[in-house]
Structure formats: structure tokens, C-alpha cells
């Protein structure tokens, strides 16, 4: 069995000096350890409460590569179970979502209630004349399930910090999406799913820490949707400018702490500035006063930027796209993209949000394709022995971290930096090399203290 010491994790990651060895994106032994020590003990996004509003409603998803089913209980609580029959390991729930009174395995017909209990075994008296203790053979339950403002998370590790402690200061940034209006948020439409041939850490890192790429990777989109030859701005809808936000913002920051990351620009008006539909742009202006009252000016105006909750939950303010990077081996990720909107928005505005998110960040989105091409090409190159063992530079903004005095929390830097990437890989390494959560927390705290010296 390969151990963390065999893999020399801290020789692959040097966050103090800004170095990363890209073997972390290709090594199958590292990947197996990730499934155990990251996806097996971190809080992972499961579903939005709006997707399972009634008792018996269920939604099928994954925790790492483990299939799980999330179910609303009769008392309104939420449980999650390993989607695996206890008889021969067959899947017991196949539909993406729906409503049910029971889950029945198609192999031998064992049936489970929505509370996970084994309730029926075909031919039980004849097949098990010695008796079968059905209470012992219920579905394996995810022991830790908690919600944060509509987002449902699960964790296999009962020794992990609670969800709110795990989120830490990233919750302040997350609230900018979840808490703009009374009534919270909901998922609109279905789930878009597609596969990208890259390691899960590539998109997670980009959403945590990389605004820098947009100036170059998305240059063609900026040129097409940007200024006209005569110097005037093209318009997409009701008075919305398509000029890049980095040209119009008065300030910008990146947040990186506890493995999580976020980056955004300070703007002077509620303009999403990411080429959304005119109805969306108008909606942000019309609801700005309520958002400012609930969140304050900075977050109410924050309608662009990138975010990732470690390890794999990402979102983009303004475009209403929320996505999970489900790992499928060291060189493949399955993307699940949701459109998340204010519940109080009109049906017309919700449709405009869905259209905007799909156009820019759906599987054929004009920005999404740029990102996917980059990640796939990187993964191809890392098949080479020299390529996957050559150190990469992670020095942007090194030593420039600070804590702000304006109420914006956490360790921050200028938006064009790699503070969040270094923090993400530090938490990644700490998890892989630690036997307990307390050891992880101690290591992360020591790193963050060193960063802020």
C-alpha cells in the first residue's frame, strides 16, 4: 500500500517559495489517496434544498467517485446514503432525481425506505431460513449532512469540523450570492453534465485563484463583445456595457484561506459586466437597494469574480453558474453545472439567468470552451516524464498578503496573484499527509501564520 511518506507530498508542493510539481495532476497513487483523505473527509456539496422540497424527493450525486442519493425525509430533514445495495453492491437509485417511497435494487429486489432502512427482501423466509437481521443491512448513511443557506453538504468524517467552521471566512463571500434577497436562492432548470479530460485540481484552482487567465484565454470573446472600432461600446440589452471589468473597476482583491479562494473587482454600479442578458443586468440594478441593505455595498456590487470552496464547489457571481468538479480518475473530471438564482426573481429573469449561464459557461459556452481547451492541453502534455516532473512557478503575489481593515475578512492579496492557489495546495498537502483533522488544522494554521508574518 502506498503511504503519504512514500509519495513525498511536501516535496511536490512548496507553498513558501511558490513551487508545484505537476505530477500531482497525473499520479494514480496520489489520486487514490485524494479519494480517501480529501473526498473522504472534506465537506462536499450534494444538492440545493430547492431540488428536494417534498418528503420522498431525492437527488443522485457523487462524493468523489462514491455515488450517493440525497433524500428529503418525512419530517422535513435531509439524509444522504451511499447509492449501493448491501447485498451485491448494485446501485439502488438510477433516476437523476424524482420522488419515491422506496429504493429497490434491480438485481435481487432488496428494498429500502427513504430513511435507508432495509424494508423488504424477496423470498426472505425461504432464502434466509436462519433469519436475516434487516436492521443491520440498511443503506450506508453519510453521517454528516448540513445545510448552509440552501446548499446541502455531506461529509463521511465525523471528526471533521462542522460545516460553518469548515467554511470559515469564505462564507462571507458565499453570502454575496446566496443572501441578496429575502427568500434565498433556488436552482433553475436541470443539471448540465459533461466530461473534461483533465485533473480536478486544474478547474478548482482556476476558480479559486485565477482571474489572470481571462485577459489572454478569453481575449477573442473580449474582442468580439468589446468596444467597436469607433471607440463606442457594444451593448447587450438594457444599457449594459461589455467592457472587461478589469478596465472599469476601482480596486480588486483575491481571498485565499483554509484552501478556499475568491477574487473580485470593486465596482461603482451594479453591472454584472460578464455579457449577461439585458433582463439580468436590469434585474441587478432594480434589486440593488435590497441587496445593499442585506449585504453592504461591497458585496451588493460584487457581480463578477471567481470562487471555490475546497475541494470542488465553484461559482461565478453575476452569471449565476454553480458547478461541481466530480473526479473521474487522475486525468478526467465530470462537470455538473447548475443555474442558481434568487427565488424572488420573476420567471422571465430566471429564464434570462439560465440563458446567460448556458451561453457563456455551458458545455459549449464561449468562455467555457476556452477554459476546457487549456485544461485538456495541459493534461496531454503531462503524459511526458520530463513535463510532469518539472517544477512550475506559483510565485504571483508571493509575500504580499495582508488582512484588510475595511471589514473584508481573511487573508487577501491583489486579484492578480496566486495566494488562493498556494493556500489550496497547502490544504491539499496537509490533508494528504495528516492522520487526523486536528493535525490538518494545526498545519494549516501554522502555514497561514507564516504567510502573514
Swiss-Prot record:
Keyword Iron-sulfur: yes
Cofactor note: Binds 1 Fe cation.
GO BP, sorted A to Z: 3-phenylpropionate catabolic process
Signal peptide: none
Catalytic activity: 3-phenylpropanoate + NADH + O2 + H(+) = 3-(cis-5,6-dihydroxycyclohexa-1,3-dien-1-yl)propanoate + NAD(+); (E)-cinnamate + NADH + O2 + H(+) = (2E)-3-(cis-5,6-dihydroxycyclohexa-1,3-dien-1-yl)prop-2-enoate + NAD(+)
GO terms assigned for molecular function: 2 iron, 2 sulfur cluster binding; 3-phenylpropionate dioxygenase activity; iron ion binding
Enzyme Commission number(s) of this protein: 1.14.12.19
Keywords on record: 2Fe-2S, Aromatic hydrocarbons catabolism, Dioxygenase, Iron, Iron-sulfur, Metal-binding, NAD, Oxidoreductase
Binding residues annotated for Fe cation, in chain numbering: 213, 218
Cited NCBIfam families: 3PPDioc_HcaE
Name assigned to this protein: 3-phenylpropionate/cinnamic acid dioxygenase subunit alpha
Species whose genome carries this gene: Shigella boydii serotype 4 (strain Sb227)
Amino acid at each position: 500500500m502506498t503511504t503519504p511518506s512514500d509519495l513525498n507530498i511536501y516535496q511536490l508542493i512548496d507553498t513558501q517559495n511558490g513551487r508545484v510539481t505537476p505530477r500531482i495532476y497525473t499520479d494514480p497513487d496520489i489520486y487514490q489517496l485524494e479519494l480517501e483523505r480529501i473526498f473522504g473527509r472534506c465537506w462536499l456539496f450534494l444538492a440545493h434544498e430547492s431540488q428536494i422540497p417534498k418528503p420522498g424527493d431525492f437527488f443522485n450525486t457523487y462524493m468523489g467517485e462514491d455515488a450517493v442519493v440525497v433524500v428529503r425525509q418525512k419530517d422535513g430533514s435531509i439524509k444522504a446514503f451511499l447509492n449501493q445495495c448491501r447485498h451485491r453492491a448494485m446501485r439502488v437509485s438510477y433516476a437523476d432525481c424524482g420522488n419515491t417511497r422506496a429504493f429497490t435494487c434491480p438485481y435481487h429486489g432488496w428494498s429500502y425506505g427513504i430513511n435507508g432502512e432495509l424494508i423488504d427482501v424477496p423470498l426472505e423466509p425461504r432464502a434466509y431460513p436462519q433469519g436475516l437481521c434487516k436492521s443491520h443491512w440498511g443503506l450506508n448513511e453519510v453521517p454528516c449532512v448540513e445545510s448552509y443557506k440552501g446548499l446541502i453538504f455531506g461529509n463521511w468524517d465525523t471528526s471533521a469540523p462542522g460545516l460553518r467552521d469548515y467554511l470559515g471566512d469564505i462564507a462571507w463571500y458565499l453570502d454575496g450570492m446566496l443572501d441578496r434577497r429575502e427568500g434565498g436562492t433556488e436552482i433553475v432548470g436541470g443539471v448540465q453534465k459533461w466530461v473534461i479530460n483533465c485533473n480536478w485540481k486544474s478547474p478548482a484552482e482556476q476558480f479559486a485563484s485565477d482571474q489572470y487567465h481571462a485577459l489572454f484565454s478569453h481575449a477573442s470573446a473580449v474582442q468580439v463583445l468589446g468596444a467597436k472600432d469607433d471607440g463606442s461600446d457594444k451593448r447587450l440589452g438594457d444599457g449594459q456595457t461589455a467592457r472587461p471589468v478589469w478596465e472599469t473597476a476601482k480596486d480588486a482583491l483575491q481571498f485565499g484561506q483554509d484552501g478556499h479562494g475568491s477574487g473580485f473587482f470593486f465596482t461603482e454600479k451594479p453591472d454584472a459586466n460578464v455579457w449577461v442578458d439585458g433582463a439580468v443586468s436590469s434585474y441587478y440594478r432594480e434589486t440593488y437597494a435590497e441587496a445593499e441593505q442585506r449585504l453592504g455595498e461591497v458585496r451588493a456590487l460584487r457581480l463578477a469574480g471567481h470562487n471555490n470552496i475546497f475541494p470542488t464547489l465553484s461559482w461565478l457571481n453575476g452569471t449565476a453558474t454553480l458547478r461541481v468538479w466530480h473526479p473521474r480518475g487522475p486525468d478526467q473530471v465530470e462537470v455538473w453545472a447548475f443555474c442558481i438564482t434568487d427565488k424572488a426573481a420573476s420567471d422571465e429573469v430566471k429564464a434570462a439567468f439560465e440563458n446567460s449561464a448556458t451561453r457563456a459557461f455551458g458545455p459549449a459556452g464561449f468562455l467555457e470552451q476556452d477554459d476546457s481547451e487549456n485544461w485538456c492541453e495541459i493534461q496531454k502534455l503531462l503524459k511526458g516524464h520530463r513535463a510532469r516532473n518539472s517544477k512550475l512557478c506559483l510565485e504571483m503575489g508571493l509575500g504580499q498578503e495582508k488582512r484588510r481593515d475595511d471589514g473584508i475578512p481573511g487573508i487577501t492579496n491583489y486579484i492578480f496573484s496566486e495566494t488562493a492557489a498556494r493556500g489550496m495546495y497547502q490544504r491539499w498537502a496537509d490533508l494528504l499527509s495528516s492522520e487526523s483533522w486536528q493535525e490538518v488544522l494545526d498545519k494549516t494554521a501554522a502555514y497561514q501564520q507564516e504567510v502573514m508574518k
